[in-house]
Amino acid sequence: MSLSNKLAITDVDLKDKRVLIRVDFNVPLDADKKITNNQRIVGALPTIKYAIENGAKAVVLMSHLGRPDGKANPKYSLKPVATELEKLLSKSVIFAENCVGKETEEIVNKATGGQVILLENLRFHAEEEGSSKDAEGKKVKADKEKVEEFRKGLTALGDVYINDAFGTAHRAHSSMVGVDLPQKASGFLVKKELEYFAKALESPQRPFLAILGGAKVSDKIQLIDNLLPKVNSLIITGAMAFTFKKTLENVKIGNSLFDEAGSKIVGDIVEKAKKNNVKIVLPVDYVTADKFAADAKTGYATDADGIPDGYMGLDVGEKSVELYKKTIAEAKTILWNGPPGVFELEPFANATKKTLDAAVAAAQSGSIVIIGGGDTATVAAKYGAEAKLSHVSTGGGASLELLEGKVLPGVDALSSK
């Protein structure tokens, strides 16, 4: 699956076409169904506006919201999103009470002049995800013929298909892979994701550095395996580093997290790194705590002394930060997935902040810095650094699967240039 040769919205003639766009409007709602964060809606505006400005007859938007488990549930209606979208676009938005069916087709086919239509939640139909849950919460597979019918129903609403929902790209859902139109292109959000991940995974400027944090080695094994033949250096940080330190150097780690299953593959990882001439950088000092809490009694430990029993490492120390900064400054492409410490608790946020500062400095001086979604994207947002980095991925699970070398069904389904 090449990331760099997929058709984009800018390659397609939209004039007088019904443009069917899969967006991600899975926004948080409060008890009164008020949207508490409209970031995802704002993120889709460039694609929606481009379709309107380039002469689309109708702009048909489809999305999921929450987990209604294949049944209509007013709690998960996209209706509040239609109101918010009208405000943001300063343009009327027609809300269709169903995402498929005769009435919806009539609304879409009547539309002219770039009319925006928002369809009701795709996941009100079991055929979107391919399954639903019964009263006992057991998964019930959707009927194959009904899935086909549902996909035909979506296909009937457009002349051109645009996918701008990267966060769902790792799911083979009907709206991601089942729309059968001659041209299937990425919207601006997906286009940017693909461009940047291609810059890292297909043609990186070197030296190429990956910074990997996280709790368990065993959770990141596919990621490490896929990146080792591609990178020049690898910083292993976060709780996962303790499994490396104890296994490789017999460092005392006290009550820090130790991944028994992961420890068995540490040797193989180091071996593979040597074979690929990859420099592995591990932390050398730690900020410790007697409990996992902001008001914990804190301490400091080095490799030589180790972490005493009753204490656990919740962040890395200044010497480690200096090592990271030096490695980051040498790199031309930096991919960061996983923070060095428990940044949610202020006493253990120092290394994360300083690593972020170094990443920002690298981006400002011309390196490509990509944040691979999840917790690290939260870090970038928390400290207001998103605009200062090359790219912050919006897809948690999708980014991870891409970095693990897996094919993303939603990307794979797009037309090639």
Swiss-Prot record:
Family as reported in the entry's similarity comment: Belongs to the phosphoglycerate kinase family.
Organism ancestry: Eukaryota, Fungi, Dikarya, Ascomycota, Pezizomycotina
Annotated metabolic or biological route of this protein: Carbohydrate degradation; glycolysis; pyruvate from D-glyceraldehyde 3-phosphate: step 2/5
Protein name as annotated: Phosphoglycerate kinase
Effect of loss of the gene: Decreases cytosolic pyruvate levels and increases mitochondrial acetyl-CoA levels. Increases production of aflatoxin and increases the mumber of cellular autophagic vesicles.
Sites where the protein binds CDP: 214, 219, 238, 338, 343
Modified residue annotations for Phosphoserine: 203
Substrates-to-products reaction catalysed: (2R)-3-phosphoglycerate + ATP = (2R)-3-phospho-glyceroyl phosphate + ADP
Residues the record lists as binding AMP: 215-216, 220, 239, 313, 344
A Pfam family assignment: PGK
Compartments where found: Cytoplasm, Cytosol; Mitochondrion
SUPFAM superfamilies linked to this entry: Phosphoglycerate kinase
This protein's UniProt keywords: ATP-binding, Cytoplasm, Glycolysis, Kinase, Magnesium, Metal-binding, Mitochondrion, Nucleotide-binding, Phosphoprotein, Transferase
Effect of mutating residue 203 to D: Increases cytosolic pyruvate levels and decreases mitochondrial acetyl-CoA levels. Increases mitochondrial localization of the protein and leads to decreased production of aflatoxin. Lowers the mumber of cellular autophagic vesicles
Required cofactor names: Mg(2+)
